[in-house]
Structures are given as C-alpha cells and as structure tokens.
C-alpha cells in the first residue's frame, strides 16, 4: 500500500537538521550603504570540500511537477552544500530525509514560500528541485570541482505527495 507524505510549512526549526532556511530574518539585518540597504547577513554557509573545489552560483529553471507525485529517489552531495533560492517568487516543495545507515529514511516534505530558500548541508538526502504551478527559476549556490559529488538512492516503493494547497 502506498505511503502518502504530509506537507508541512517550511520553518527554520523544522528544517534545522537538514540545513538552513534562507529568508529575511530581522535578527540578522543590518543597515549598509548609508542606511539605504538592509543586509540580512550570513543566512547560510556554503561548503565546498576537496582539492581545487570552489563555490559557484548557478541559475536552475525548474519545470512544474504533476501531482500526485511519486518520490522514488533521493540524492545527496558528499563534498558540498547546495542552496536553492527562488528568483521567480513562486512556492516550491522541499523533500529531505535523515540518513539511516547510508540510505535515506522516510522523506519529509516542506512547502517553501516564494520568499524562502533552503541550504542543504553536505550529505543531506534531498529530492531534486520541485517547482510548483509553472516554470520557475532558482539561484543555486553549490560546489564545483573534481570528485563525484552526487550519490543517488532509489526506493523500492515510492512515497506519494498529494497536490499541495497553495
């Protein structure tokens, strides 16, 4: 029998085991440029391990997912973090799992608002980008360099996500 996954709102507390939520947090705000700019400082830390590795900035264009959606795989990046920040201002789904002896456990699903991003720490199991509703662009900060920075796991039985209420 298929297992359905509940969708929860994305909060810093709920996501803390997997990385950081990237959003305008008043606690991190400081005024710069003569008081004309609010800087929300150090919301996440990019990681790039390995000889010659570097942090790069990318633009990803995600196609919207159809629902119900089968979560049949997860991936992780052993040498670097990966962050996703929506440029299009559209909500998206974030699917993560705790590690259970080298494989992903039962996935957890979060609904990110269009003004929230996420930073997955190194080795965090997550599903690839899940845009909602329409084609959406994301600013992605991750690692470039030698070595295999992608590990994938395929579930024998997929988990199912029902269509989120937006």
Curated annotation (Swiss-Prot):
Swiss-Prot/TrEMBL cofactor(s): Ni(2+)
GO process annotations (BP): allantoin catabolic process; purine nucleobase catabolic process
CDD domains named in the record: cupin_UAH
Catalytic activity: (S)-ureidoglycolate = urea + glyoxylate
Superkingdom to which the source organism belongs: Bacteria
UniProt cross-references to InterPro entries, sorted A to Z: RmlC_Cupin_sf, UAH_cupin, Ureidogly_lyase, Ureidogly_lyase_bac, Ureidoglycolate_lyase_dom_sf
Protein's pathway: Nitrogen metabolism; (S)-allantoin degradation
Statement: the UniProt record of this protein carries the keyword Lyase: yes
Keyword Lyase: yes
Keywords, comma-separated and alphabetical: Lyase, Purine metabolism
Record-linked SUPFAM superfamilies: RmlC-like cupins
EC number: 4.3.2.3
EC top class named in words: lyase
Pfam family, any one: Ureidogly_lyase
HAMAP family per record: Ureidogly_lyase (MF_00616)
Quaternary structure and interacting proteins, as annotated: Homodimer.
Function in brief: Catalyzes the catabolism of the allantoin degradation intermediate (S)-ureidoglycolate, generating urea and glyoxylate. Involved in the utilization of allantoin as nitrogen source.
Family: Belongs to the ureidoglycolate lyase family.
Protein name according to UniProt: Ureidoglycolate lyase
Organism, as annotated: Rhizobium leguminosarum bv. trifolii (strain WSM2304)
